[in-house]
Amino acid sequence: MIAVGLGVALGVEYRREEFTDDRDDRLDGTIFFTDSVTGNVIPSDVMGSSPTPDTDGDRDVFSAFAELAVPLVSEDMNIPLVHRLDAQLAIRAEDYSDVGSVAKPKVALSWYLHPDFQIRGAYSQGFRAPNLEQINATGIRRVNGGREDWILCEATARANGTDFDTGDCDSVSVESVRSGGPDLQPEENDNISIGMVYQPSFVDDLTFTLDWWRIEQEDVVGIFGDQNQISLDYVLRLNGSSNPNVVRADPTADEVALYTAAGLTPAGEIIEVADQYVSLNPREFEGIDFGVNWGLDTDQLGTFDFKVNAAYLREAFQAPSAEANQILAAVESGTADEAVDVPGSEDRVQQNGRPEWRSNASVTWRHEGWGAGLSYNYVGEVIDTSVTGPDGEIFVVDSFETINLYGEYTFAEWLGGDTRVRIGARNLTDEEPPIADEFASGYFPSLHSNRGRYWYLDLRKEF
């Protein structure tokens, strides 16, 4: 028997998506710059800017969804260990004119064993179509520095009769050419979560939450990476072939002599690296989220709200592609130097923008128009895979902690009432972001902020 209160939602949608990136002729590669002295031709007429070809694309999308909320057991049914039981069933389908059709379901369950204690769980499948730029981009060129031409390092070490040393390997800048993948398919994922909520009736406004979650993704749109392409070229050249995505100039006489002395096929300077958008191998993520919220009302001192939240990333795994496995196998067998790796492949916990731990805590207070708040944020350390230490050791980006503080007063009558004045400080202790080499800014903007301590004054009026 189903409890009373069945809910149904249905919907359909049509949308037209269009994308146009039409740049000036001096930026899109139409007008080149020719050095009048050297005769060198640069495919952009603006200093410090790589050419970005004009791009456009469009598609039609039809979608439909259905959702059913089913109260299976209600409080008045008096079933042991089932105070309340609710289910949610849903499905969404979309048809894209360029990448095909998908349909994905969702099932969720909420089970109250007791008014104080809830167990919740959900399983869903999701999808994301590649955006129009990822499908239609036509050779976007960017110059990236800090790349290692491993075959040149190997040749230099062999010719000099020395051991391969990453400290002696000079970084090079390469032009990475990124183009769209017209055969890309929608990304698909499976999501599962199980958790509990405890709200003890003997303590007012106290809530504990604990949730475990897991996400498995397939056909995630991404790139292999220009450094990985160069590393693959290194492994293939050690075996007498090469990576066609790494385009090199004809070797000079000096390069021919160097590689010949090293017993390797001569290779010239890297001109460009083709790095097309592709559907990557499966990814798996798993973590646990914790939370504690407590609201405390007092007669004399006002209202306090305490919050603590933490997120633990237990697993972040990228299944290596066939090309990545070639590199990893060469390193494991000793064919390629152990300094060569495949950033973004295999275990990714603590790599770059994926700290193992993140947390925040806050306390706020309000009483008779007055208010104040104090918050603390923590981001755990990560490993910067784009750089190593002088002896080839991993480069650890330190954890980052910040504190924010504010005080406020809400006027009951000034400017018509409900007018709040707040003064506060963000990053109260003036922390600087830990140094990283992953971005030109020198830090991870997805994790850290370069804004030091700053004060602000905020005036808000409600009507």
State what each model feature region is.
Residues 130-208, 273-288, 352-357, 450-454:
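Outer-membrane beta-barrel signature, preferentially recognizing the C-terminal barrel domain
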Residues 216-219, 314, 375-386, 409-463:
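C-terminal beta-signal and adjacent terminal beta-strands/loops
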Residues 80, 211-386:
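Gram-negative outer-membrane beta-barrel transporters
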Residues 8-17, 58-110, 189-193, 375-377:
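Surface-exposed extracellular loop regions of Gram-negative outer-membrane beta-barrel proteins
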Residues 6-10, 64, 83-89, 105, ...:
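Transmembrane beta-strands of outer-membrane beta-barrel proteins
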Residues 1-6, 73-85, 116, 152, ...:
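Short loop/turn motifs that connect adjacent beta-strands in outer-membrane beta-barrel proteins
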Residues 14-20, 72, 91-97, 123-129, ...:
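Transmembrane beta-strands of outer-membrane beta-barrel pores
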Residues 1-82, 320-353, 358:
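Outer-membrane beta-barrel transmembrane domain signature of Gram-negative proteins
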